Amino acid sequence: MCTLFIADLHLSEHEPAITAGFLRFLQEQAIHANALYILGDFFDFWIGDDDPNPLHQRIAQALMALKNAGVPCYFIHGNRDFLIGSRFAKESGMTLLPQEKVLEIEQHRILILHGDTLCTDDDAYQRYRKKVHNKFIQRLFLLLPLTIRLRIAKKMRSRSQSSNQYKSEAIMDVNAQAVINTFKQFNTQWMIHGHTHRPAIHTVDIDGKPHYRGVLGAWHTEGSMFKVTSDKIELIQFPF
């Protein structure tokens, strides 16, 4: 048996192929796992659990079916879907996790997170992140009518895409010292995250000992997952 990790699907009604690929992944791969962990940016944006988007309902039903088949699903918020709350979690059968979580799987000790907190060189993004994760601001936003929330979300997304065009690749990637500090803070040999859309396994030397940072790819043209078994941790890219 295995444990699976995915991130950065950016599910949207405008990308039906990705949705179909994810549903096929649940039926053909996740169904055979011990557990499924989704490490953020599951949806392209999220304006509240009260959004009656049919896609959200379809995904919730598929995840609940997975849970009913004996495979639990766990979720860490990303920068696109940080407003997913207890209502959707209940409807989908997902368990919401904190922004960092240490797992003990067989002999592996693994830290999981979305990954945006590691990108400390991007000062503008970190300021934005601090604002939108403010609970008071979130409560105010969720009090707005859905139409206004949707308008704000689309405007923020457009602004983010425009801003990122002028940022260097290095700024939008993780900061090496932030990675080392995080490894030391949580005392793990492995870290798995998403966010940067740069699938790879990096070896990080800390005090003469190897540590491993696994990065999930985004589901743009193919699927990406980490598969953890008793004897290995592997990054797998696969067609939809």
Swiss-Prot record:
Descriptive protein name: UDP-2,3-diacylglucosamine hydrolase
Required cofactor(s): Mn(2+)
Sites where the protein binds Mn(2+) 2: 41, 79, 114, 195
Pfam entry (one): Metallophos
Pathway connected to this protein: Glycolipid biosynthesis; lipid IV(A) biosynthesis; lipid IV(A) from (3R)-3-hydroxytetradecanoyl-[acyl-carrier-protein] and UDP-N-acetyl-alpha-D-glucosamine: step 4/6
Family matches, as Gene3D superfamilies: 3.60.21.10
Record-listed E.C. numbers: 3.6.1.54
SUPFAM superfamilies on file: Metallo-dependent phosphatases (SSF56300)
NCBIfam families linked: lipid_A_lpxH, PRK05340.1
GO-annotated molecular function: manganese ion binding; UDP-2,3-diacylglucosamine hydrolase activity
InterPro entries, per database record: Calcineurin-like_PHP_ApaH, LpxH-like, Metallo-depent_PP-like, UDP-diacylglucosamine_Hdrlase
Catalytic function, reaction form: UDP-2-N,3-O-bis[(3R)-3-hydroxytetradecanoyl]-alpha-D-glucosamine + H2O = 2-N,3-O-bis[(3R)-3-hydroxytetradecanoyl]-alpha-D-glucosaminyl 1-phosphate + UMP + 2 H(+)
UniProt: Mn(2+) 1 binding residues: 8, 10, 41, 197
Binding-site residues for substrate, renumbered to this chain: 79-80, 122, 160, 164, 167, 195
Gene name, Swiss-Prot/TrEMBL: lpxH
Enzyme class: hydrolase
Family the UniProt entry places it in: Belongs to the LpxH family.
Listed GO CC annotations: cytoplasm; extrinsic component of plasma membrane
GO biological process: lipid A biosynthetic process
Co-factor note (free text): Binds 2 Mn(2+) ions per subunit in a binuclear metal center.
Lineage, broadest ranks: Bacteria, Pseudomonadati, Pseudomonadota, Gammaproteobacteria, Enterobacterales
Subcellular localization(s) per the UniProt record: Cell inner membrane
Organism (species): Proteus mirabilis (strain HI4320)
Role this protein plays: Hydrolyzes the pyrophosphate bond of UDP-2,3-diacylglucosamine to yield 2,3-diacylglucosamine 1-phosphate (lipid X) and UMP by catalyzing the attack of water at the alpha-P atom. Involved in the biosynthesis of lipid A, a phosphorylated glycolipid that anchors the lipopolysaccharide to the outer membrane of the cell.
